[in-house]
């Protein structure tokens, strides 16, 4: 016979491990899962229900009573019902006075109501100590015990003692409570579970746009042009050849765009002469998305590496190699060895391998489990110094790939240069601008600005002895 979820966990604990009584209003999925977890951790659980006689599938060892009776059994009450059903609490206002009322509700969409559910609850039951908590934990995670992905619990409330009690409960359940302040923060906490990759949207849209643009650009040069001029069918290039051009171009462009906002911010600070003015919203959001941009770029670099590995087994490549070998045998002609070509080929491969290795290192150090083990200087060294070195290597990899064809007019098709030349525009611009910013005369002033000096401040004169480096 198959065991139920409640049977899979031992719910019997010693009296010395008893934590107290907790009341849960609501017998839905979340209420039952939270009650089961509390029973496992030694709490006595009393459920409050509008129909206690018909409530079923509750954890073994828990009681089910009506709301008023359940409220009288504990001074900590978890409200596991939706906001639409808060009306019954007005009748229990006297019974709930002085009790800790934990609101775990979420809405269907962000900013659905003018005020947060917790603030509305505090207005509805003014005598209770309302605390917002546990709304970022799913019922499935509580029931299955897989809390690794959602272990943090945001807690906010106006009463510090009530918050401390809720945070103690969270720690007993094996969770990590984070104090977010007063109930004013409840709206932000309620919006948090409703967010869908907010910091990934801009990188996703940008990378998608770049991919589409470069794919169409390469298709015009390598598929449409041969068909228009010579009726040659080159559509097979759409599967491997063109994607293997698009992926590295997109990766290099995104990597450059990771460091471009920092340069723009430095230029803006130099122009303003102060760090105490906010950046434009678009630049601020761009800087916040740099980690996501870098990880997306790393993903495209991985795709480029994988696509490159399958090149030798492609039919087109094997056909060209076999055909060239047969032609060479029939004509009895040998191609002379070119030392310069060998240098370019080996340098191109070496730069690509080193660039990809450092790229991978940047991605690893951006993981929270790794970044938490290093201090700020170490993290900045990897992400900034090694990051720019990665950009230099990847840009050099692309330059050497072009080799002698870089400025050759023969590579123009319908006056369109090769796609890799377009890929070099942003990286080279970033590197040139960075080189200018690290010049001592500019870097010294920028450092002072970031340390609090202001060019137009009345204290700036004495700080720089009446002189500026710019």
Curated annotation (Swiss-Prot):
<keyword id="KW-0406">Ion transport</keyword>
<feature type="transmembrane region" description="Helical">
    <location>
        <begin position="202"/>
        <end position="224"/>
    </location>
</feature>
<feature type="binding site">
    <location>
        <position position="139"/>
    </location>
    <ligand>
        <name>NADP(+)</name>
    </ligand>
</feature>
<comment type="similarity">
    <text>Belongs to the STEAP family.</text>
</comment>
<dbReference type="GO" id="GO:0046872">
    <property type="term" value="F:metal ion binding"/>
</dbReference>
<dbReference type="GO" id="GO:0008823">
    <property type="term" value="F:cupric reductase (NADH) activity"/>
</dbReference>
<feature type="binding site">
    <location>
        <position position="67"/>
    </location>
    <ligand>
        <name>NADP(+)</name>
    </ligand>
</feature>
<dbReference type="GO" id="GO:0015677">
    <property type="term" value="P:copper ion import"/>
</dbReference>
<keyword id="KW-0472">Membrane</keyword>
<feature type="binding site">
    <location>
        <position position="290"/>
    </location>
    <ligand>
        <name>FAD</name>
    </ligand>
</feature>
<feature type="binding site">
    <location>
        <position position="366"/>
    </location>
    <ligand>
        <name>FAD</name>
    </ligand>
</feature>
<dbReference type="InterPro" id="IPR013130">
    <property type="entry name" value="Fe3_Rdtase_TM_dom"/>
</dbReference>
<keyword id="KW-0274">FAD</keyword>
<keyword id="KW-0285">Flavoprotein</keyword>
<keyword id="KW-0812">Transmembrane</keyword>
<feature type="binding site">
    <location>
        <position position="148"/>
    </location>
    <ligand>
        <name>FAD</name>
    </ligand>
</feature>
<protein>
    <recommendedName>
        <fullName>Metalloreductase STEAP4</fullName>
        <ecNumber>1.16.1.-</ecNumber>
    </recommendedName>
</protein>
<feature type="binding site">
    <location>
        <position position="106"/>
    </location>
    <ligand>
        <name>NADP(+)</name>
    </ligand>
</feature>
<feature type="binding site">
    <location>
        <begin position="81"/>
        <end position="85"/>
    </location>
    <ligand>
        <name>NADP(+)</name>
    </ligand>
</feature>
<dbReference type="Pfam" id="PF03807">
    <property type="entry name" value="F420_oxidored"/>
</dbReference>
<comment type="function">
    <text>Integral membrane protein that functions as a NADPH-dependent ferric-chelate reductase, using NADPH from one side of the membrane to reduce a Fe(3+) chelate that is bound on the other side of the membrane. Mediates sequential transmembrane electron transfer from NADPH to FAD and onto heme, and finally to the Fe(3+) chelate. Can also reduce Cu(2+) to Cu(1+). Plays a role in systemic metabolic homeostasis, integrating inflammatory and metabolic responses. Associated with obesity and insulin-resistance. Involved in inflammatory arthritis, through the regulation of inflammatory cytokines.</text>
</comment>
<dbReference type="GO" id="GO:0031901">
    <property type="term" value="C:early endosome membrane"/>
</dbReference>
<feature type="transmembrane region" description="Helical">
    <location>
        <begin position="419"/>
        <end position="439"/>
    </location>
</feature>
<feature type="binding site">
    <location>
        <position position="171"/>
    </location>
    <ligand>
        <name>NADP(+)</name>
    </ligand>
</feature>
<dbReference type="InterPro" id="IPR028939">
    <property type="entry name" value="P5C_Rdtase_cat_N"/>
</dbReference>
<dbReference type="GO" id="GO:0052851">
    <property type="term" value="F:ferric-chelate reductase (NADPH) activity"/>
</dbReference>
<dbReference type="GO" id="GO:0033212">
    <property type="term" value="P:iron import into cell"/>
</dbReference>
<keyword id="KW-0479">Metal-binding</keyword>
<comment type="subunit">
    <text>Homotrimer. Interacts with PTK2/FAK1; the interaction may regulate PTK2 phosphorylation.</text>
</comment>
<feature type="binding site">
    <location>
        <position position="269"/>
    </location>
    <ligand>
        <name>FAD</name>
    </ligand>
</feature>
<dbReference type="GO" id="GO:0009055">
    <property type="term" value="F:electron transfer activity"/>
</dbReference>
<keyword id="KW-0813">Transport</keyword>
<feature type="domain" description="Ferric oxidoreductase">
    <location>
        <begin position="249"/>
        <end position="391"/>
    </location>
</feature>
<feature type="transmembrane region" description="Helical">
    <location>
        <begin position="342"/>
        <end position="362"/>
    </location>
</feature>
<keyword id="KW-0967">Endosome</keyword>
<dbReference type="Pfam" id="PF01794">
    <property type="entry name" value="Ferric_reduct"/>
</dbReference>
<dbReference type="GO" id="GO:0045444">
    <property type="term" value="P:fat cell differentiation"/>
</dbReference>
<keyword id="KW-0333">Golgi apparatus</keyword>
<feature type="binding site">
    <location>
        <begin position="27"/>
        <end position="30"/>
    </location>
    <ligand>
        <name>NADP(+)</name>
    </ligand>
</feature>
<keyword id="KW-0560">Oxidoreductase</keyword>
<feature type="binding site">
    <location>
        <position position="140"/>
    </location>
    <ligand>
        <name>FAD</name>
    </ligand>
</feature>
<dbReference type="InterPro" id="IPR036291">
    <property type="entry name" value="NAD(P)-bd_dom_sf"/>
</dbReference>
